[in-house]
């Protein structure tokens, strides 16, 4: 007992030292916004156009162009009534001297062609090699920072750590649900804003296309909901399939059965010792037998952990897309996006680590598996940079499908752990507070984004 107390005090001292190191690193990291020179954050982060429209150096030129041509555009929709007046008005502006004798629709199309071309040919303020360096460096930073925190947190699946693990699991479920409902689904529902285009042509188009836009918006929202349900059903199907392939010996397949087999081998050991009066030879087979029941539930429990890794991989992929697209728009915007995603990922990765520990992974294995999900972020960053001229980087189904996976993991794999055993009132209050803290962090991050 005295040795355990001494070990606990020693580990506590090491924890304080590591926390001091993290505070210093955090102070250096959060000084980065000073480099952003007052740049705001884009309201949406998954498309390159969003970040380009946010560039203040390009905005004044685009605004001048829109206001200069406003009357010209407005006149085109009335050419059926006063064609001559509109034609002369366009000639007075001097935009299309060569188009004086041409069809009126030709001039209108030519105008829009120049408008679109100007937007697609907007260039970033850095060369591509520097953009690649900054984007990959930011992605590695986002992957490494949570890893340092995971190294500090003293956590395993032992009985002594069980109350602390349950609190972290509650925090993880709150983070997953908050991430799905407050971050992923809203971004999928409103992927980008058409503010500038709507400002130019609002007087002309809204009266004619309100019904069509309403129909389009309704079908889009329904498709988002279907993809969320598809994510939930897909994760359920994968877990069912894995259980069937494992031979059906996992009747209590979740971690409900993980602590319970431990007393069984103990009874076998004691009975073997009582039956064997002479030596240690009968005890060795008993030890070998006692390891087999422990391995079975561990394999069953790991299903939820690997499902969570798959969802986290897809989520990190979208974060990589955001980083690559933001650095294409400008270095300052890339730094702001990196800090935002880092604040989002730190609590998320801590929750994922707790889920892996509860799933039966060792501490070292859980940390290595968390690093594997960083490959998703690197792949997303590379895809955004390689498709630099391609507009939106992410498929429309990725975000809602990932949200469905997060909802499934939180409600099926994590929350049942909190109801597994009757806990004291104080422990239950801690778990509820941790869950609300996870949701609150996602609210703050969603507001900041």
Curated annotation (Swiss-Prot):
Gene Ontology molecular-function annotations? enzyme regulator activity; zinc ion transmembrane transporter activity
Spell out the Pfam families in the cross-references. Zip
Question: In what ranges is there compositional bias, type Basic residues?
Answer: 63-80, 249-268
Sorted alphabetically, the Gene Ontology cellular component annotations on this record are: axon; endoplasmic reticulum; endoplasmic reticulum membrane; neuronal cell body; perinuclear endoplasmic reticulum; synapse; synaptic vesicle
Skewed-composition ranges (Basic and acidic residues): 81-91, 100-121, 193-218, 269-283
Q: Where in the cell is it found?
A: Membrane
UniProt KW keywords: Glycoprotein, Membrane, Transmembrane, Transmembrane helix, Transport
Q: Name one GO biological process term.
A: positive regulation of border follicle cell migration
Record: glycosylation sites: 316
* Record region (Disordered): 57-121, 188-218, 247-299
Report TM segments. 19-39, 135-155, 167-187, 222-242, 371-391, 395-415
Membrane topology field: Multi-pass membrane protein
Q: Please, which domain of life does this record's source organism belong to?
A: Eukaryota
Q: What does this protein do?
A: Negatively regulates tyrosine hydroxylase activity.
- Family stated for the protein in its record: Belongs to the ZIP transporter (TC 2.A.5) family. KE4/Catsup subfamily.
- Name of the protein this chain belongs to: Protein catecholamines up
Q: From which source organism is this entry?
A: Drosophila melanogaster
Record lineage: Eukaryota, Metazoa, Ecdysozoa, Arthropoda, Hexapoda
